Amino acid sequence: MIPLSQKNLVEIRKHSLEDYPNECCGIVIGLAGSVDKDILFRCTNIQNKLHEMDPKTYPRDAKTAYNIDPRELFGIFNQIDSKKLVLKTFYHSLPDHDAYF
């Protein structure tokens, strides 16, 4: 289990409530072995856009799926590389449905 600061746990909960009824998604990065200076990124869930463009390939909408904007991912991973940080976790909410896999 990845430890997260209380501040980031509160922020993730807030994010999920604000994006409801859609899934929220985000990424936490920081220094290895520490949670004090972790950086939380709220990411854009582009699942509805993908579903509208191609419902056959993307049959689920943002109420039951998430897909992070690749430009945001690129920017976050650039920060990881340039600042010598590590990826701590991806997060997303599960509004009104269970985890399934």
Model regions and ranges:
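Conserved catalytic cores of phosphodiester-cleaving nucleases, focusing on short active-site segments
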Residues: 89-91
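Conserved beta-strand-loop surface patch within small alpha/beta domains used
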Residues: 1-86, 95-101
